[in-house]
Curated annotation (Swiss-Prot):
This is Pregnancy-associated glycoprotein 66e. GO terms for molecular function: aspartic-type endopeptidase activity. GO terms for biological process: proteolysis. Glycans are attached at N4. Disulfide bonds: none annotated. Highly expressed in the placenta between day 60 and day 100 of gestation. Belongs to the peptidase A1 family. Its EC number is 3.4.23.-. Keywords: Aspartyl protease, Glycoprotein, Hydrolase, Protease.
Length: 15
């Protein structure tokens, strides 16, 4: 679950 929360912000930066 913690991994998912870290990917959320990462994906926003990529967009």
């Amino acid at each position: 679950r913690d991994s998912n929360v870290t990917i959320l912000p990462l994906r926003n930066m990529k967009d």
